[in-house]
Amino acid sequence: MKIALYSILLITVCYLSSTDAYLFDPKAVDALLREIRARLQATGKEPHARKIEQETEEIKKEELMQAEDVEGSGSGEEIEGSGEVISTITGVPIMDNEEKKDLKPENFPRPEPIFDKYGNLKSKDKLEALTYSNFKKQAPATLQDHYNLNPTGTLQMLQGLDIHGGSGGYHRALSGGYLPPSTYDPYNVNWHSYGDEGVKMKDKAISVFRRVIAPGR
């Protein structure tokens, strides 16, 4: 068997030498080398691949150590006389934890709607939260008259027109029980984001608004 293989190899070499077929295709050689390397890597015997992996791990370790050094050093320089600490990396002032604690929360209330998504009143107790005394201090005379004639409807207008506080600051204020500005227009509320349910809520709000401000009330 060995003699036969040797004979075939010898004949092949002689043939290649006589026909110039020993000029191999570079693409074929490259493909062959890739196949050999892939098989060596699969068996774990490729030294070049192991070397690359080791170098990659070392680079990762060095980067982690450098990042830890930057964090541990404080990365800040105090500007003389200003009391501020500037980051040496970003150049942005660093806020102390004490300053963060001193920050006051948002004063503007986050309203909880008194209507459900269909425009129906959730609770009468919430409707009474805006008392007549508070209303009398802030409301113009015309709205006070409306309140005297129809307190429930007036409060619905004040607290429920913008049911979900969806568009703009004064709409949120309206849901929180504050009086709307004189230019308030229920038709201009951002209802489109609610889809079909928004149409129902808008119709409900507009009907309340019309009932409250109707002449002769």
From Swiss-Prot:
User: Is this entry keyworded ATP-binding?
Assistant: no
**Where is it mostly found?**
nucleus
Gene Ontology terms: cellular component: extracellular region; nucleus
Protein location: Nucleus; Secreted
Q: Which UniProt keywords apply?
A: Nucleus, Secreted, Signal
4Fe-4S is among the record's keywords: no
Q: Which GO terms describe its biological process?
A: collagen and cuticulin-based cuticle development
Q: Which superkingdom?
A: Eukaryota
* Signal peptide coordinates: 1-21
* Reported phenotype of the disruption mutant: RNAi-mediated knockdown causes dumpy body shape. Defects in cuticle integrity.
Primary role:
Probably acts downstream of the Wnt signaling pathway.
Protein name in UniProt: Protein dao-4
- Species annotation: Caenorhabditis elegans
Ranked from the top, the taxonomy reads: Eukaryota, Metazoa, Ecdysozoa, Nematoda, Chromadorea
